[in-house]
Amino acid sequence: KDKNNKNKTLKSFNKSLFTNKIFQEKKFLMKNIHDKTYIFVNCIKSKTSLDYEKLGSNLYVFLKTNKIEQTFIEANTSPLTNVQLEKLLHGAQLKSYDFDIYKTDKSKTVITNLYVVGNKYKKNNLLRNKLNSLLEGIFLTRNLVSEPGNVLHPDEYAKRITKLRKYGLKVTVYDQKKLKKMSMNALLGVGQGSVRGSYLVTIEWNGTKNKSKPLGFVGKGVCFDTGGYSLKPAKFMEDMTYDMAGSATVVGLLKSLALRKAKINAVGVVGLVENMPGANAQRPGDIVKSYSGQTIEVLNT
């Protein structure tokens, strides 16, 4: 197409895709597809992995916004190395996440596929496995955090974590009966106003025979936090389903370690409760004895 049209296309493309200051135009390749001109620009200012992931993320947004269902990156003419291409694809995959399982109308969803072609491109299986393992863990975390409180209550959450056993993780679930015997009263107190159970779940990954102490990760898993009798304002109540994001991060992390067969030992611990007002709920001023034997006066539930 004529020079003026190319400049117009490039200007439009830069506005929609390259809004971050870390990007700096260096060279671009234009392809004409069905009378539409698309540009792929190599515009990395600094050569860190995160920059290429951000480029992939922005590229995915551009493709989806313009309803481009299939895109091919020709590796033989691309200035990016195989590792850089892997990072770009990883960024696009992360951006493709969409929690839409409860949407009634999915017909408007545009599936965007991004391909790398050319004999120059050789898949790095080690890096790809690492990135895919990371992706699986991140998506699990996002799925758990995105679930509404009426679906992902402590009972359901504990069940979902047990499904990680198929990846070689050792999962142990301590229910209310066991927690009472262990004198885990501080944890039980938070959830005693709910009709749901309260749980402590440990997730262990043994990736090496080394007897050194494992890495430990602890995550808060309040599936919904009304504040109990110290009730939270209605304005902020709907966001209290995210009060379990810490535990979801731990769960996703352990899955990633298992999938990549990480050569470390690690253990994750998550407490799963629902903080609700009720006839049996914990009151401000209550005193409980914790697992350590320390007594705690509850001033705010």
PLM regions with names:
Residues D35-F40, F139-R142, K213-G216, C223, ...:
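Glycine/charged-rich beta-loop-alpha catalytic/anionic-binding loops adjacent to active sites
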Residues E86-L94, G191-S194, K232-T241, R283-S290:
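A glycine- and small-aliphatic-rich helix-loop capping segment at beta-alpha/alpha-beta transitions
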Residues Y174, V218-K220, G227, V269-G271, ...:
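Generic beta-strand/beta-sheet core signal
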Residues A262-T301:
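A glycine- and small/hydrophobic-rich beta-loop-beta segment
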